[in-house]
Amino acid sequence: MRNKAVLDLHLVSDSTCETVIAVARSAVEHFKSLEVNEFVWSLVGSKRQVDKVMLNINPERHNLIMYTVVDDDLRKYLKEKATAQSVRCIPVLAHVIREISCYLQVTKDPNAHPHKLGDEYFNRIDAINYTISHDDGQNLWDIDQADIIIVGVSRTSKSPTSIYLAYRGYRVVNIPLVCSVQLPVDPATIADKLVVGLTIDADRLIQIRRNRLISMKHQENCNYVSYEQVVEEINEMKKICAKNRWPTIDVTQKSVEEIAATIIQFFNRKNNRTGDALY
C-alpha cells in the first residue's frame, strides 16, 4: 500500500484566519492521498510574529504557507522569510483580487481589512453562545430571538447543524420531537420564524441510534431502536411539520454542510435575502 504524502500546512493571517482556512481546506479535499498537518496562525500583525511562525516550521518536512495579509510591508517580509527558508508561500486571494482589478479597471482599497474584529465577529460569537444555550430544547423562553428553529426526532443531526449555522452567524434553536409528547412551544408564537424539520430513513436512523448506544456502552433500548417506534416518531414529526407548513429536509444521505446550506436557502427565501451569511 502506498504511503500518504505528508504536508505541514501553515495558515497565516493578520486577522481571524477564516478565509485562508476555508480556502485551504477546500483545496486539500482534492488530494485524498495527502496527509495534512494544519497549523493556524491568526492575528499575525508584526514582523516579530512572522518570525515566530517561521521558527515553528520544520525544515526536515514538506511545508507550505497559505496566507491573507493586508499590509504590503508585512506581506513582503513574510514572502522574504519564506523564500530564505525555501518554503513555498501562496497568497490565497491575490489572483482573485488581481482578476477583479483588471476586469473592472479599478484598484484595490489599500485600507481594506477583511474579517477585521468588529461587529461581524462579535455578532457571530453571540450567535454561537445563543445556539449552544438553546440546544436540545433548552431555554425556550427567548425563542423569539432565534433566526432559525430546527425540529426533529433524536439523532437527526439537529445539534451539529445548529452549531454549523451558528458559526455562520445564525441564532438557532433546536427542539427534539418526542413521540406522544406535546411540542414544548406553541406553533402560533413562532409563526414568523423559519422552522425546519429534519427527517431521515427509518433503517438509517436505527443504525445511527444503535451505534450511539454502543459508543455510550448502554444496553440496547428496545423502544429507542424499535422499527415500529422509529417509524411512528418519523411519521408524527412529518405530520407536525405538514400541519404547520414547515419545510422538511431528508438528511439520510446529507452531510451537515449540505443540510445547513439548504436551511440557509430556506431562510433567504423566507426573508427575501440573497447570499448565504447573516452577518
Curated annotation (Swiss-Prot):
Give the enzyme's main class according to its UniProt record, as a single word: transferase
Q: What is its EC number?
A: 2.7.11.32, 2.7.4.27
Q: Name the InterPro entries for this protein.
A: Kinase-pyrophosphorylase (IPR005177), PPDK_reg (IPR026565)
Annotated ADP binding sites: 152-159
Write down the chemical reaction(s) this protein catalyses. Answer: N(tele)-phospho-L-histidyl/L-threonyl-[pyruvate, phosphate dikinase] + ADP = N(tele)-phospho-L-histidyl/O-phospho-L-threonyl-[pyruvate, phosphate dikinase] + AMP + H(+); N(tele)-phospho-L-histidyl/O-phospho-L-threonyl-[pyruvate, phosphate dikinase] + phosphate + H(+) = N(tele)-phospho-L-histidyl/L-threonyl-[pyruvate, phosphate dikinase] + diphosphate
Keyword Kinase on this protein?
Answer: yes
UniProt-recorded Gene Ontology molecular function terms: ADP binding; ATP binding; phosphotransferase activity, phosphate group as acceptor; protein serine/threonine kinase activity
Which Pfam families does this one have? Kinase-PPPase (PF03618)
Similarity section? Belongs to the pyruvate, phosphate/water dikinase regulatory protein family. PDRP subfamily.
Q: What does this protein do?
A: Bifunctional serine/threonine kinase and phosphorylase involved in the regulation of the pyruvate, phosphate dikinase (PPDK) by catalyzing its phosphorylation/dephosphorylation.
NCBIfam families, alphabetically? PRK05339.1 (NF003742)
Q: What is this protein called?
A: Putative pyruvate, phosphate dikinase regulatory protein
Q: Which organism is it from?
A: Anaplasma marginale (strain Florida)
